From Swiss-Prot:
Covalent S-S links between cysteines: none
InterPro entries the UniProt entry points to: G_ENGA, GTP-bd, GTPase_Der, KH_dom-like, KH_dom-like_a/b, P-loop_NTPase, Small_GTP-bd
Phylogenetic placement of the source organism: Bacteria, Bacillati, Bacillota, Bacillota incertae sedis, Caldicellulosiruptorales
UniProt family annotation: Belongs to the TRAFAC class TrmE-Era-EngA-EngB-Septin-like GTPase superfamily. EngA (Der) GTPase family.
Assembly description: Associates with the 50S ribosomal subunit.
Gene name in the database record: der
Functional description taken from the UniProt entry: GTPase that plays an essential role in the late steps of ribosome biogenesis.
Protein name per UniProt: GTPase Der
Domain KH-like as annotated: residue spans: 352-436
Domain EngA-type G: 3-167, 176-351
GO biological process: ribosome biogenesis
SUPFAM superfamilies: P-loop containing nucleoside triphosphate hydrolases
A molecular function GO annotation: ribosome binding
Length: 439
């Protein structure tokens, strides 16, 4: 595994700004409101030829009894426990505080190497302020500015100096990317936690307690998976501030970089228009889709309950007729293993390649049974079809006139392909081209 570095400190010292600078993208929510980064966000960076993981933790408020801030403290402790080196960030503008002292005591107990980074030192004249941080009795304080980049290289030099370069193994780059998506409070974080066997992300009954998209790595049946637990998507009418706007965009971005989307529904509630909207993002992005109905343990049911719920899904999510439906419980683990098996199965279909000969044998059979349509005496002619891409499967169909290839006939060809080849869980993209057009 790659080395892991946790960025730890009290709220609003600039941890997320440093994290974003290190990984080169706006992964963590950055705002002036203390406590905005509620959870652990994981990214990857490289320095001096060494690739390592970086964890951005929520700010530690040592004295707060607020339920979210208490959970953030626990999450920071998890990050400390799983890290190899800790970057302890303090605020050079504010100076040393009692909260800094308490965090330092917490870190000292871990016995992990600590790099003390004094942030918001934007010019040389401000550097004398760093000396008060020697009182913490940790490593030499390093002046830096996460916003402007000065001193960041010095911090990273100190970090990599602690790494044992022998035996560092990289995480598989070809892992299957799985986005767990759904409206708030459907149990997305609980599902990820059950799979990982640890309280990896904050779980609370308060909707929206997972604000950012969080990557976790796990192997299932020897196959590496990257699980992306996303902020629950809210209806746009409720997205009234910057934090919610950032998170919605991040969730859509998580869908874009995934291979498979697990669309989580709350089995204790009817399928809603909001569920359909969220599922629509995954469908429009061309991702493999699995519908998982969570909290099934909390549903009063008889032998008809599952079928009745499936009818709701068919009505509200009619565009996902190809997606398998599983009834699960993230709380008890009911059918979670089956869900992971289905992820591997759908991914196999998502990457499936079919020879041109096989495709055209099926095409000939389909057009014989139900001949192509005609309009004003002109008959649609389908010359051949070939697969030109995967993730999702893309089929180029060459015809004499694209205008004659009506949607209804395209749907017929798609259904015939699905009947012959296994494309469970994945959309099929058709590229209609007139003969003579380039691939």
């Amino acid at each position: 595994m790659k080395p892991t570095v946790a960025i730890v400190g009290r709220p609003n010292v600039g941890k997320s700004t440093l994290f974003n600078r290190l990984i080169g993208e706006r992964r963590a929510i950055v705002d002036d409101t203390p406590g905005i980064t509620r959870d652990r966000i994981v990214g990857e960076t490289e320095w001096r030829g060494i690739t390592f993981n970086v964890i951005d933790t929520g700010g530690i408020e040592p004295y707060s009894e607020d339920i979210i801030l208490k959970q953030m403290r626990r999450q920071a402790q998890f990050a400390i426990d799983m890290s190899d080196v800790i970057i302890f960030m303090v605020d050079g503008k504010t100076g040393l505080t009692d909260a800094d002292r308490e965090v330092a005591n917490m870190l000292r107990v871990s016995k992990k190497p600590i790099v003390l980074a004094v942030n918001k030192i934007d010019n040389i004249s401000e550097q004398p302020i760093i000396y008060e941080f020697y009182e913490l009795g940790l490593s030499d304080p390093i002046p830096m500015s996460a916003e402007h980049g000065s001193g960041v290289g010095d911090v990273l030099d100190a970090v990599v100096s602690y790494f044992d370069k022998v035996g560092i193994n990289e995480i598989e780059e070809d892992s299957i990317k799985v986005a767990i998506i759904g409206k708030p409070n459907t149990g997305k974080s609980s599902l990820v936690n059950y799979i990982l066997g640890e309280e990896r992300v904050i779980v609370s009954d308060i909707p929206g307690t997972t604000r950012d998209a969080i990557d976790s790595y796990v192997e299932f049946e020897g196959i590496p998976l990257t699980l992306i637990d996303t902020a629950g998507l809210r209806r746009k009418s409720k997205i009234y501030d910057n934090i919610e706007r950032y998170s919605m965009l991040r969730t859509i971005s998580a869908i874009e970089r995934s291979d498979i989307c697990v669309i989580l529904l709350d089995g204790t509630e009817p399928v809603s228009e909001q569920d359909a909207k969220i599922a629509g993002y995954a469908y429009e992005a061309g991702k493999g889709c699995i519908i998982a109905v969570n909290k099934w343990d909390a549903v009063e049911k008889d032998e008809k309950t599952a079928d009745e719920y499936k009818k709701q899904i068919e009505e509200k999510l009619s565009f996902l007729k190809f997606a398998p439906v599983l009834f699960i419980s993230a709380k008890t683990g009911f059918r979670v293993k089956k869900l992971l098996e289905t992820v591997l199965y759908v991914y196999g279909n998502y990457t499936r390649r079919i020879t041109t000969g096989q495709i055209n044998d099926v095409l000939a059979e389909a057009t014989t049974i139900y001949q192509p349509p005609s309009d004003k005496g002109k008959q649609l002619k389908i010359y051949y079809m070939t697969q030109v891409g995967e993730k999702p499967p893309k089929m180029a169909i060459f015809v004499n006139d694209k205008d004659l290839f009506h949607f209804s006939y395209q749907r017929y060809i798609e259904n015939y392909l699905r009947k012959t080849f296994d494309f469970t869980g994945v959309p099929i993209v058709f590229l209609i081209r007139e003969k003579g057009e380039k691939d």
